A protein has these predicted regions:
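Conserved short alpha-helical segments that host acidic/polar catalytic motifs at enzyme active sites
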Residues: 4-123, 128-193, 198, 286
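Short internal beta-strands
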Residues: 15, 221, 288-291
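A conserved beta-strand->alpha-helix junction
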Residues: 21-26, 217-228, 325-343
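PRPP-dependent phosphoribosyltransferase catalytic core
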Residues: 57-58, 73-75, 80, 99, ...
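Flexible loop/turn segments at secondary-structure boundaries
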Residues: 76, 85-87, 110-112, 135-136, ...
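Extended, hydrophobic alpha-helical segments in both membrane/secreted and soluble proteins
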Residues: 195, 202-209, 213, 217, ...
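Short, glycine/charge-rich flexible loops or terminal/linker lids adjacent to PRPP-binding catalytic cores
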Residues: 212-259, 270, 298-303, 307
Length: 390
């Protein structure tokens, strides 16, 4: 039974397709259930009632979520799913003896607002901050398992953030170093004359890769920051047009050179193919390509709006076939064990593993059936997105 069906049972109406609306309505229904029939109603709500409501929400909501909500007369409640798939960070600030707290998906928010970084909200944990500044927390799941989404480190997070004790910047440096070692093993006579990143999330890995290989690092593309993510746009023509507007090449960095282009990942392949075309149009004599992430071949069901499987460039293709599609001399993907090692950090974290489902098809929450995946894909394919955008 999906959350929408469960909320109809609770006599709650969902007005949008937002998963946040559904999740918080589920939590609100559990809060209401806690005080039903109790003298005083919501005024009699106790701290233990809130923790129990979060516990029941965990049992009823499968998947990934980090939630922050307000309860009238009480204060703020923040909670994270039992696998900690999505990040949730807490900062603290003291003003004349009053303790302020801030919650956000990334630690960098604390620096921007002048708060001290406190800690990550743990998997399955709920945090209550009262109006008077008092604070309490409890892990509201009997068996939380910490498996955050590895794609946060690859692409989504800002490099100056720290996620679950691991520096995003440091993780991307290690991704670049791992790629460099692969190149040295598999292409010892690579002939690379310049390493060029795809801005912005490919930059840090490209810098470290260039340093490890002893090859010049060059900024060959200028990014238009007013164009959104192309891999989630509906329709091939729209994506191709957006790629043209999103990046512009600097010809002197390509003319007559053998260049290695480094990007964080390859999804549909449209951006990669157009970038390779731009490098060749700018005069590159050879173009190689490296991805900080392994091939994406499985749907993400934990909050990332990725395409249907048959729209991934890696779906049903070998590396050689992908190389031909994007038009490069050779193509190198990060290997999953190397990516996991890069994101685990320097051994100063209690993380054991990550959710890597878009790479290996192993969904950490369990219960993801082919029927469910087919339903998700029917809502994400190009035809569905074009219909929704009309």
């Amino acid at each position: 039974m999906c959350i929408r069906d469960r909320l109809e049972y609770d006599h709650r109406r969902i007005n949008t397709s937002s998963d946040s609306e559904a999740l918080l309505n589920l939590f609100a229904a559990e809060i209401q259930r806690s005080v039903n029939g109790r003298p005083g109603g919501m005024e009699a709500l106790a701290e233990d009632d809130i923790f129990r409501a979060v516990e029941r929400t965990h049992l009823r909501a499968e998947g990934s979520y980090s939630a922050i909500t307000l309860i009238t007369g009480w204060g703020l409640v923040a909670f994270r799913d039992p696998n900690g798939i999505r990040p949730l960070f807490m900062g603290i600030n003291d003003i004349d003896g009053f303790t302020e707290r801030v919650f956000a998906s990334e630690s960098v928010v604390c620096k921007a607002l002048g708060f001290e970084m406190d800690r990550d909200v743990a998997p399955g944990e709920a945090v209550i901050v009262r109006m008077d500044g008092s604070f309490s927390s409890k892990v509201c799941h009997p068996e939380p398992v910490h498996t955050p989404c590895i794609f946060e480190h690859v692409y989504f997070a800002r490099p100056d953030s720290v996620l679950d004790g691991v520096s995003v910047h440091g993780a991307r440096l290690r991704m670049g170093a791992a790629l460099a070692r692969r190149i040295q093993r598999e292409y010892p006579d690579h002939g690379i004359e310049a390493v060029v990143p795809v801005p912005d999330s490919g930059r840090i890995a490209a810098m470290e890769l260039a340093m490890e290989l002893g090859v010049p690092f060059r900024e060959g593309f200028v990014k238009n920051r007013y164009i959104g993510r192309t891999f989630i746009m509906p329709g091939q023509s729209m994506r191709k047009d957006s790629v043209k507007k999103k990046l512009n090449s600097i010809e002197e960095e390509f003319a007559g050179k053998a260049v290695l282009i480094v990007d964080d990942s390859i999804v549909r392949g449209n951006t990669s193919r157009r970038i390779v075309e731009m490098a060749k149009e700018a005069g590159a004599k050879h173009v190689f390509f490296a991805s900080s992430a392994p091939p994406i071949v499985h749907p993400n069901v934990y909050g990332i709006d990725m395409p249907a499987r048959n729209e991934y460039v890696a779906h049903g293709r070998t590396i050689e076939e992908i190389r031909e599609v994007i038009g490069v001399d050779w193509l190198l993907y990060q290997e999953l064990p190397d990516l996991i090692e890069a994101c685990l950090g320097a051994g100063d974290t209690d993380l054991a593993s990550f959710d890597c489902s878009c790479f290996n098809g192993e969904y950490v929450t369990g219960g993801i059936t082919e029927e469910y995946l087919a339903k998700v894909e029917s809502m994400r394919n190009d035809a569905a997105k074009r219909k929704a955008s009309v």
